[in-house]
Amino acid sequence: MTAGAEPPDPDTLDVEAVLLASEQRPISPEAIAIATRLAERSGAPVHVLTNARIWGTSFGFPNPGLYPSKGEWDKQRAIVDETVRALERAGVEADGHVIGARNATKRIVREARRLRCDAIVMTADESRNRFVGNFMWSQEPQRVRRRADVPVYLVTAP
């Protein structure tokens, strides 16, 4: 599959694992439903991943004041726990974890490779102009789609 291309119909894709990812936003029930469809068809597990954003560097060096706060970590853990429970209620094997990264796109794609996922599902905002979108954190799912070498299903946030 070509990076950035529209993914195939979820009912035609055989997968060994699915990554249900978020750059920091809550994972929508619609995204959970698509991940469930993909996983049930092949009996695959779903790995849930969220990112607690690291806000940058100070003079080129990591700065503890720019790391996620305890509250931010807890919020992301709650999103993962809620999503894993929803997947397990649907009868899908699921696990999850939270990462901390400045560049969520690179980490999500790297985790998908490491976990040998054949598809990524993310909740996303409407796509913006690519030039403007590159400056917006909310366009991270679109950047994941452009960079990933597996199908990326973007579910528009309600």
Regions found by a protein language model. Give the residues of each.
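Active-site phosphate/pyrophosphate- and oxyanion-stabilizing loops and adjacent acidic/basic residues
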Residues: 36, 109, 142
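General small-molecule cofactor/ligand-binding pocket signal
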Residues: 47-49, 95-99, 153-155
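Structural beta-alpha unit
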Residues: 1-13, 88-120
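Glycine-rich, Arg-bearing micro-motifs that act as flexible, cationic patches
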Residues: 122-146
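A short acidic, glycine-rich active-site loop
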Residues: 65-78
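Short, flexible loop segments at boundaries between secondary-structure elements
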Residues: 142-158
